[in-house]
């Protein structure tokens, strides 16, 4: 049986407002949501990204000739306790697949430091993560991570046991059935997500501003990307909801009122077709936009926030002013206008076409009234 519900506002697409591969940060914007759904979706995604995502981590370290972690090592500045602490900071990337399963594996590498190595480095050779982990096994996120400092020639085998998991697992909870007597277990931080923030703002649909815009800021440690974190969290949530679908005795559909949708589009296009000189901006900000060949609001909102600061003479103060002005108009930088057929490539032509069509309609109405 099919059940028909009234119109239910849902986002059509998520836009990437800001992305920085160097810092593993991204800001995502989704709108419009019915009132309250922004918090419902945002909080659920935040909790799943912080608690449920998996990544590889070192769970044990074995250094040849070192029976326990409380031992000092001849020719190495750090004791074994500090070396273990340094290994905890290792970040390794690998997404397990059918071809590369998530089984625990041991990486073995012979670390050799010669007298020539010491002479070239003023008598102290810094062993880093890339000296211990071969690139073919895992992608090394922080290859320059300092592990220990060698002061005498040495040759020792280092074994690292790598496992996949989620959350934070202390060393005493690791289950290693083939553990050797000189293998030292390590606390493992599997969670690849460092920080998740989400914000809810009001957004406009037609004349009504009582809808939610969800803004999510995702920061990872490099073992997964922000896009992967968001995607995996969504799939985890959907998998959990599947069990509740056993009560699916009805096919639910939602009413779409074309007249309302067309009215919303006309109102938005009227707003977007405004010239930069028609909104109240400081002379400096207006001149910066004019210098960047931005003539209309449509051209402005198509630009991601990160690109704005690339414009000549454009600073944080001007950016904040423009963001505040757009917020007053229920707009924001980096908007996705594809459902209206507008993209950064055709925005000038689309706005010109809309203005011409609007002018013709006005002239037609004026002509009809004159009869």
Swiss-Prot record:
The enzyme's E.C. designation: 2.7.7.6
Entry-linked Gene3D superfamilies: 5' to 3' exonuclease, C-terminal subdomain, DNA-directed RNA polymerase, insert domain, RNA polymerase, RBP11-like subunit
Pfam families named in the record: RNA_pol_A_bac, RNA_pol_A_CTD, RNA_pol_L
GO molecular function: DNA binding; DNA-directed RNA polymerase activity; protein dimerization activity
Record's GO cellular component terms: cytoplasm; DNA-directed RNA polymerase complex
Domain notes from UniProt: The N-terminal domain is essential for RNAP assembly and basal transcription, whereas the C-terminal domain is involved in interaction with transcriptional regulators and with upstream promoter elements.
NCBIfam families: PRK05182.1-2, PRK05182.2-3, PRK05182.2-5, rpoA
Subunit structure: Homodimer. The RNAP catalytic core consists of 2 alpha, 1 beta, 1 beta' and 1 omega subunit. When a sigma factor is associated with the core the holoenzyme is formed, which can initiate transcription.
Family named by the database record: Belongs to the RNA polymerase alpha chain family.
Name of the molecule in the record: DNA-directed RNA polymerase subunit alpha
């Amino acid at each position: 049986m099919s059940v028909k519900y009234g119109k239910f506002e849902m986002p059509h697409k998520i836009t990437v407002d800001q992305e920085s591969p160097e810092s593993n940060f991204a800001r995502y914007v989704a709108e419009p949501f019915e009132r309250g759904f922004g918090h419902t979706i945002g909080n659920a995604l935040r909790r799943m990204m912080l608690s449920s995502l998996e990544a590889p981590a070192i769970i044990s370290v074995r250094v040849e000739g070192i029976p326990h972690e409380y031992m000092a090592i001849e020719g190495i500045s750090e004791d074994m306790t500090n070396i273990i602490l340094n290994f905890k900071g290792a970040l390794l990337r690998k997404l397990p697949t059918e071809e590369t399963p998530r089984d625990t594996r041991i990486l073995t590498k012979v670390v050799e430091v010669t007298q020539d190595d010491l002479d070239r480095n003023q008598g102290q050779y810094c062993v880093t993560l890339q000296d211990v982990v071969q690139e073919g096994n895992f992608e090394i996120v922080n290859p320059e991570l300092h592990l220990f400092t060698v002061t005498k020639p040495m040759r020792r085998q280092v074994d690292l046991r790598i496992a996949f998991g989620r959350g934070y697992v202390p060393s005493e909870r690791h289950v290693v059935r083939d553990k050797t007597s000189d293998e030292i277990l390590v606390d493992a931080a599997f969670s690849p997500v460092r920080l998740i923030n989400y914000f809810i703002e009001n957004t406009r649909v037609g004349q009504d501003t009582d809808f939610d815009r969800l803004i999510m800021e995702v920061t990872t440690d490099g073992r997964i990307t922000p896009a992967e974190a968001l995607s995996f969290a969504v799939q985890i949530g959907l998998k959990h909801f599947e069990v509740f679908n056993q009560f699916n005795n009805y096919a639910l559909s939602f009413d779409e009122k074309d007249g309302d949708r067309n009215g919303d589009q006309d109102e938005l296009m009227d707003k977007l077709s405004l010239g930069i000189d028609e909104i109240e901006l400081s002379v400096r900000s207006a001149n910066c936009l004019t210098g960047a060949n931005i003539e209309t609001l449509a051209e402005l909102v198509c630009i991601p926030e990160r690109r704005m600061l690339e414009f000549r003479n454009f600073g944080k103060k001007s950016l904040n002013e423009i963001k505040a002005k757009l917020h007053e108009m229920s707009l924001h930088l980096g908007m996705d206008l594809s459902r209206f057929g507008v993209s950064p490539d055709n925005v000038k032509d689309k706005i010109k076409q809309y203005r011409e069509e609007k002018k013709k309609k006005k002239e037609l109405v004026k002509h009809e009234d004159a009869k």
